[in-house]
């Protein structure tokens, strides 16, 4: 155990916490342009064609982000908003694209969890 004098000379070091979403640079979201929109397969034991996009952000970072929901209208040069949040079965995908913001439309005919998919409230019959 160090003496008071030793602590005065050299204080205790705090643990440095590494960010899980470095490209956001401590911002809640960032804007970017899609450079490639494609599908990829998840790790074992899952099987699917997951929709992802490579996005060049305004700060110069190039990241892979996930497009959630059923169907999307993204193509190359679409402007999107990304947020943090990884996809557990897709290695290297640490960001999500925000639905219903900028060029990406919300999910059509979505009834539940609408706010997460940028869907408007359905009209009453």
From Swiss-Prot:
Basic residues compositional bias, start-end: 113-125
Name assigned to this protein: Small ribosomal subunit protein uS12
Gene responsible for this protein: rpsL
Gene Ontology molecular function: rRNA binding; structural constituent of ribosome; tRNA binding
UniProt xrefs under InterPro entries: NA-bd_OB-fold (IPR012340), Ribosomal_uS12 (IPR006032), Ribosomal_uS12_bac (IPR005679)
The UniProt record lists the keyword rRNA-binding: yes
Listed PROSITE patterns: RIBOSOMAL_S12 (PS00055)
Residues carrying 3-methylthioaspartic acid: 89
NCBIfam families: rpsL_bact
Subunit structure: Part of the 30S ribosomal subunit. Contacts proteins S8 and S17. May interact with IF1 in the 30S initiation complex.
SUPFAM superfamilies, per the entry: Nucleic acid-binding proteins
Secretion signal, residue range per the UniProt entry: none
Region (Disordered): 106-125
Keywords for this protein: Methylation, Ribonucleoprotein, Ribosomal protein, RNA-binding, rRNA-binding, tRNA-binding
Keyword Plastid listed: no
Role description: With S4 and S5 plays an important role in translational accuracy.
Record family assignment: Belongs to the universal ribosomal protein uS12 family.
